[in-house]
Amino acid sequence: MFTYITSLPSPEWEKSFPRTISILGSTGSIGTNALDVIKSHKELFHIVALGGGKNVQLLAKQAIQWKPDYLAVQDETSKEALIPLLPINYKPSIFVGQQGYVKLASLPEVTTVLSAQVGAAGLHGTVAAAKNGKVICLANKETLVLAGKLIKNLCLQSGAVILPVDSEHNAIFQALYTRNPKTVQNIILTASGGPFRNKKYEFLKNVTPEQAINHPNWKMGTKISVDSATMINKGLEIIEAHYLYGLPSEQIKIVVHPQSYVHSLVEFTDHSLMAHLGTADMRMPIAHCLAWPNYLNVGVEPFVLSKIGTLTFEEPDLDSFPCINLARDALVAGTSAQIILNAANEVAVDAFLKKQIGFMDIPILISKALEADSTPEPTTLESIEALDQQTRHTISQWIEVH
C-alpha cells in the first residue's frame, strides 16, 4: 500500500516565507535552475549557503550575487582558488569537503536544503539534513538508492520532510499526496527513451559520449544524460519510488513517452489514470518543492494542449536497455545490491565519458558487480560508504584490464 516516506510540513508552512535556503550543488544543472527560480521570487527566499564543488569560477559569481554567509567547496585547492575571486569586503565562512556540505545542511538558521549534488557525493549532506529536521528538496536520487532505509528512519526521528525534485517523482507526489493510500494500484514513471530510443545492440555498441549526452528533450548534466541514454536513470527512479512511496517493484511501472509532456501517472484501483503534464523544464518541479504547497510562475511558456500534437507511449526495450531490469533485481536483492548498482554505474559512466570503455560495457560491468555481491546488508552510514568505496575500487580495477 502507498505510504509516503515522511510526514509533510505543518499547515503553517504554506505561509512561512521568506524560506531560508542551503543549496548543495549550486553550480550544477539543478542548482543553477534553482537560483533562476529564486531570482524570479526574491521576496520568498533567502539564500544562506551555497556549495559548489570544484567549479569555483561559477561559485564565486553566485556568491557575489547572493552574498550567502556560508560557502562549501570540494577541497583545499578549490578554497584557495575561490578566496581571491571574492570581494575584499565579503567574508563568508568557507567549508571544505564532505564535512563542509554536512555543515551547510545542518545550519540552524536554514529551514530548507536543496540536495542537488550528483551521485553518491550527495549522501552525507542529505543524511545531515535528515538528522537535523530540515525540509529536504531532494534532487539526488542516488541518496535513496544508497540509503533509503536509513534516510527514512532519520526523517521519522527528526521530523525532516522530503519533497521530490525529480520531474517524474514530483509529478507522482502531486498526484498522490492528498489521496487515500488504499486507492493506489500502480505508479507509472515515464521515460523519454533518451537519444537512442529504438536503437539496437549493433548501433549501441559504437555510440560515443558526444552522442550519449545529446538528450532530445531535457537539458541536464553529463552524468545524468548518460544515465538517460542507458535508461538506468529509470532503474534508479524505480528504487527511489520504492522508498518514497512504499510500493514494491511490481507496482512501479515504466512507459516510454518520447515527447516528455506527461511526466508520470498514477493508476488507481478502478483502473483510472491521473497524469501530470507540462513543459520539460526543471524549474517547475524545483519551484514546486521550494515553495510547496504553493505554485510559482517561473517564466515557463503556457502548456497549450491544442499545440502539442500527438502523445505516444510504448513499452521499453529491455533487451537493448538491460539496466532497467538490473535495477529491479537490485531492489529485490536489498540494500547492498543497490549500493553496488549505483557505485558500478558511476564508475562505468565516468570511464565511458573518458572513452575507456564502450557504451554497452556499462550494463556489463554493473551486472558483473551484482553477480559478485556477497555482502551483508549495511545498516550504518559508515558501512554503506565502505561498500560504495569497495565497489568503486573493484570496478576501476576491472576497467584497467579491460
Curated annotation (Swiss-Prot):
Mn(2+) binds at D166, E168, E237. Belongs to the DXR family. NCBIfam families: Dxr. Catalyzes the NADPH-dependent rearrangement and reduction of 1-deoxy-D-xylulose-5-phosphate (DXP) to 2-C-methyl-D-erythritol 4-phosphate (MEP). 1-deoxy-D-xylulose 5-phosphate binds at K141, S167, E168, S192, H215, S228, N233, K234, E237. NADPH binds at T27, G28, S29, I30, G53, K54, N55, N140, E142, G221. It catalyses: 2-C-methyl-D-erythritol 4-phosphate + NADP(+) = 1-deoxy-D-xylulose 5-phosphate + NADPH + H(+). It comes from the Bacteria. It holds the Pfam family DXPR_C. It comes from Lawsonia intracellularis (strain PHE/MN1-00). Keywords: Isoprene biosynthesis, Manganese, Metal-binding, NADP, Oxidoreductase. One of its GO terms (biological process) is isopentenyl diphosphate biosynthetic process, methylerythritol 4-phosphate pathway involved in terpenoid biosynthetic process. This is 1-deoxy-D-xylulose 5-phosphate reductoisomerase. InterPro entries: DXP_reductoisomerase, DXP_reductoisomerase_C, DXP_reductoisomerase_N, DXPR_C, DXPR_C_sf, NAD(P)-bd_dom_sf. One of its GO terms (molecular function) is 1-deoxy-D-xylulose-5-phosphate reductoisomerase activity. Pathway: Isoprenoid biosynthesis; isopentenyl diphosphate biosynthesis via DXP pathway; isopentenyl diphosphate from 1-deoxy-D-xylulose 5-phosphate: step 1/6. Its cofactor is Mg(2+); Mn(2+). Its EC number is 1.1.1.267.
